Curated annotation (Swiss-Prot):
A GO molecular-function descriptor: histidine-tRNA ligase activity
Any GO CC annotation of this UniProt entry: cytoplasm
Designated name of the protein: ATP phosphoribosyltransferase regulatory subunit
Pathway given in the UniProt record: Amino-acid biosynthesis; L-histidine biosynthesis; L-histidine from 5-phospho-alpha-D-ribose 1-diphosphate: step 1/9
This protein's UniProt keywords: Amino-acid biosynthesis, Cytoplasm, Histidine biosynthesis
Primary localization class, coarse: cytoplasm
The protein's role, per its UniProt record: Required for the first step of histidine biosynthesis. May allow the feedback regulation of ATP phosphoribosyltransferase activity by histidine.
Localisation per UniProt entry: Cytoplasm
Complex formation: Heteromultimer composed of HisG and HisZ subunits.
InterPro entries: aa-tRNA-synth_II/BPL/LPL, HisRS-like_core, HisRS/HisZ, HisZ
Record-stated family: Belongs to the class-II aminoacyl-tRNA synthetase family. HisZ subfamily.
UniProt-listed Gene3D superfamilies: Bira Bifunctional Protein, Domain 2 (3.30.930.10)
Miscellaneous: This function is generally fulfilled by the C-terminal part of HisG, which is missing in some bacteria such as this one.
Length: 407
């Protein structure tokens, strides 16, 4: 039997680890530059916490065996866990709270997608207890700064507004509304067109919703011709103000598309929602996603008190895919600086001492000991394959013999 990871899981080998660590380190540097502090939450949570008051579907969560105190699950995203921690553990801190993270998340694939990836790596931020256009602008500009600092070659920001989209969907009866939402989220125009609509008016409205994407000014003109409730009209006005603020805050225009059909997988968003999209070899990648969630914190508050929040998460795998064919990522795993080779059994302790002296020199050296059992030819083959820079042959007595292989 050849042992492999289970379906939906995979191993990361040293070079890929180094490359993805490079991405994560750059993101953490940018997050820190904007005043965000890293938080680490538990991989395992109560199922009730993970479901975020019903905003996250039960079927999405990979559940663990029953615990005597309740059902447990692996986090499918970080926002709910961070919201829980902020409300229950950080109640006495000053506001707003700027928190960032990098972590793995786990999701059940949709029905019929056996073998699809179950574990994902994300990095992102949450700006908690902060509402209004300034907070929205900070998050969007931070997304842009991250993508520019990483050197992502082609990317675009798709921005929607959950309140406006809900207002536009309000005429649809509930079963049909869910189907339309699914088609919008999956960009599935064929299915959308063939749904069972009770009237031609609703079908035309669904088709119009699908097409509400493009230049911000043009999309807003289309929306102005539709009937919106008062909350929807207020959201549109806020969206206009946000677009102006973002454009005025940058030396060059943001690659931005207004897309009022944007619907996120998790249903706790209340304001702006967005996706960052990249392209490689005619394949689209969702680099990241996020939005405003002004009701989520109240789910975890002992008295149900709501507070504003907004955040986003980057999908590290998709960032990696967009950078893989560039020269930006490290192209080699770290090499060994020194290989220390005891020439006799009596020289082994001296070799360990010599290696430790090199490590203690403060030069952050990578020093390995040859563990014996190999001929000189085999050692030299290992040195070439692993790009060892220097050798130290340690005799029983006398000075080490130093060889510089790569410099």
């Amino acid at each position: 039997m050849i042992h492999q990871p289970p379906a939906g899981a995979r191993d990361l080998l040293p070079l890929e680890v180094v490359q993805k660590a490079w991405i994560n380190d750059r993101l953490q540097q940018v997050f820190g530059g904007w005043g965000y502090q890293r938080i680490v939450t538990s991989t395992i949570e109560w199922l009730e916490t993970l479901m975020a008051g019903g905003a996250i579907q039960h079927s999405t969560v990979i559940q663990l065996q029953d615990n005597s105190a309740g059902q447990l699950g692996l986090r499918p995203e970080l926002t709910a866990s961070i919201a829980r921690a902020a409300v229950t553990r950080m109640a006495d801190t000053t506001y707003p709270q700027r928190l960032c993270y990098r972590a793995n998340v786990f999701r059940n694939p949709p029905s019929g997608h056996h073998g699809k990836q179950l574990e994902f790596y994300q990095a992102g931020v949450e700006l908690l207890f902060a509402g209004g256009i300034l907070a929205d602008a900070e998050i969007l500009l931070l997304v842009a700064d991250c993508l520019e600092q990483l050197g992502i070659p082609q990317w675009q920001l798709l921005i929607g507004e959950a309140g406006v989209t809900r207002s536009l969907l309000s005429p649809f009866p509930d079963p049909l509304k869910s189907q339309v939402c699914h088609c919008l989220a999956q960009l599935d125009y064929v299915t959308l067109e063939n749904l069972d609509y009770p009237s031609s008016h609703l079908k035309e409205r669904a088709q119009l919703l699908f097409d509400l994407r493009g230049n911000a000014t043009e999309v807003l003109e289309k929306v102005a011709k539709l009937e919106l409730d008062k909350a929807g009209e207020e959201s549109i006005n806020n969206l206009k103000s946000l677009m102006r603020l973002i454009n005025d805050s940058r030396s060059k225009p943001l690659p931005l598309t207004l897309d009022l059909s944007v619907i996120q997988t998790f249903d706790y968003y209340t304001g702006i929602v967005f996706k960052a999209v990249g392209k490689t070899d005619n394949q689209l990648h969702i680099l990241g996603q996020g939005g405003r969630y002004d009701q989520l914190l109240g789910v975890y508050h002992p008295k149900g008190q709501s507070a504003p929040g907004i955040g986003f998460s980057f999908n590290v795998e998709d960032l990696y895919a967009c950078l893989l064919n560039t020269s930006i990522l490290p192209q080699l795993a770290p090499s060994i600086d020194w290989l220390i080779i005891p020439q006799t059994d009596e020289a082994r302790s001296t070799a360990f001492q010599y290696a430790q002296n090199l490590r203690d020199s403060g030069k952050n050296l990578r020093v390995a000991i040859d563990l014996g059992g190999r001929s000189e030819a085999e050692i030299r083959e290992y040195v070439q394959q692993n790009r060892v820079q220097q050798l130290a042959w340690i005799p029983e007595k006398g000075e080490p013999i130093i060889e510089v292989i790569f410099s």
